[in-house]
Amino acid sequence: MPLPNQIATSNVETKNFASLKRSDEPIAIAQASRTPAKIYFDFQATTPVDPRVLDAMLPYFTKKYGNPHSRTHSFGWESEKAVETARKQVADLIGAHEKEIIFTSGATESNNLAIKGAVDWKAQDGNPVHVITTQVEHKCVLDSMRFLEEKGARVTYMKVNKDGVIDLEELKRSISDDTVLVSIMGVNNEIGTVQPLEEIGKICKERNVLFHCDAAQMFGKLKIDVNKMNIDLLSISGHKIYGPKGVGALYVRRRPRVRLVPLFSGGGQERGLRSGTLPTPLIVGLGKAAAVCQEEMQRDLSWIESLSKKLYTCLKENIPNVIKNGSLQTNPLRWFPGCLNLSFPHVEGEGLLMALKNIALSSGSACTSASLEPSYVLRALGNDDELAHSSIRFGIGRFTTPCEIKEVAKQTTSAVKKLRDMSPLYEMEQEGIDLKTIKWT
């Protein structure tokens, strides 16, 4: 059976999708269960649960319901064994030891525990602390940084270039004697930019600074090796990799040992770092999702890349002046192709979303989608407010089909042309008027 990257996307027949993509029955079931009239293109916000993951979880809701911390009977032993199996499945995907995996409620909690926990531990001696991050991190990381600033920590927010990538030399210059932590995400949730983690980790190790990575958008999609990348803390989400919502994990390096102050008190579960009864069904789901990614990551990536290129090519060929936000670099990889962020000048992003009401799209992070403010990520790239307001994020995933790519390209092209026809500014630009020279009153 040919793999997705061996198929010319222009020749892919929709009716043959199942035979080209997977022979697995669960994949076919997942595709068949989706409503044809609605198309899901928001895989950065969340992913559907893979049928194989659901099958693994179900027994722990109904039959194997023991508390994994109850060690006096077989119900508890059974659940504990399932949790430890999942712990190893997660660890294997990032090249870690299973004892380095702490289960949490999701990447937001993992980020908070990593950042606040590490800084609080370092600050116990009363010395000043300095933390480095970037201007394009997820909101939960930026809010954690502001929390630390209110407590007296000094925080440096590094700028990024037009592709969303940090300057490694600037990172070196930013590290000072009181720097205790560098927190930089692996893949950006809005533009898909991939940061040079191995180089960042090397710098941090040389300067004896902890390196935390928010890998919510990277885990299970791109190769991660925490030892090769010298990552000390790594945040993981379950629902971004076709697992359940409400579960995640934090990798915490053991050698040399990374010390954290827990966020809250309780029974001392998870090595005393995260108290509370573990949700066995959700953890089993996270473990199974990680195991599936371990087997199919490269196949998924090849498939997603082929569909992403097809969509981008179709839109560029049929819509004038389409701007790609973020990098297109593939060697080394600086962009995850499942996250395609495009700007359509003279088209309001919110208006385009309304015009494409049968397609699940986003104009930015799901956590800030209720805000009408322009994306702070796009503004950090140097885009003005108008361009930032005209952006749409196309999310492509494991279950996306060529038929959906074709339909999304068709509907987007039609909607953009219709909205531009209603724009007097676009009409003026088409007539050769340089809008930047006009003095508006």
Curated annotation (Swiss-Prot):
What Gene Ontology terms for biological process does this UniProt record contain? [2Fe-2S] cluster assembly; intracellular iron ion homeostasis; mitochondrial tRNA thio-modification; tRNA wobble position uridine thiolation
Q: Which cofactor does it need?
A: pyridoxal 5'-phosphate
Q: What is its main location?
A: other
Q: What top-tier enzyme class does this entry carry? A: transferase
Task: Tell me if Secreted is a UniProt keyword of this record.
Answer: no
Query: Which residues, renumbered to this chain, carry the PTM N6-(pyridoxal phosphate)lysine?
Result: 240
Listed A to Z, the keywords are: Iron, Iron-sulfur, Metal-binding, Mitosome, Pyridoxal phosphate, Transferase
Entry-linked Pfam families: Aminotran_5
Q: Name one GO cellular component term.
A: mitochondrion
State the Gene Ontology terms under molecular function.
Answer: cysteine desulfurase activity; iron-sulfur cluster binding; metal ion binding; pyridoxal phosphate binding
InterPro entries named among the record's database cross-references: Aminotrans_V_dom, Aminotrans_V_PyrdxlP_BS, Cys_deSase_IscS, Cysteine_dSase, PyrdxlP-dep_Trfase, PyrdxlP-dep_Trfase_major, PyrdxlP-dep_Trfase_small
Q: Which residues make up the binding site for [2Fe-2S] cluster?
A: 367
Transferase among the record's keywords? yes
**Superkingdom, according to UniProt?**
Eukaryota
Kindly list the places in or outside the cell where this protein is found, as annotated in its UniProt entry: Mitosome
Which sites bind pyridoxal 5'-phosphate? 107-108, 189, 217, 237-239, 277
Q: Where is the active site?
A: 367 (cysteine persulfide intermediate)
What EC number(s) would the UniProt record show? Answer: 2.8.1.7
The UniProt catalytic activity note for this protein reads: (sulfur carrier)-H + L-cysteine = (sulfur carrier)-SH + L-alanine
State the function annotated in the UniProt record: Catalyzes the removal of elemental sulfur from cysteine to produce alanine. It supplies the inorganic sulfur for iron-sulfur (Fe-S) clusters in mitosomes.
Q: Which HAMAP family match?
A: Cys_desulf_IscS (MF_00331)
Q: How does it assemble?
A: Interacts with ISD11.
Provide the family line. Answer: Belongs to the class-V pyridoxal-phosphate-dependent aminotransferase family. NifS/IscS subfamily.
In terms of NCBIfam families, this protein maps to:
PRK14012.1
What this protein is called in its record is Cysteine desulfurase, mitosomal
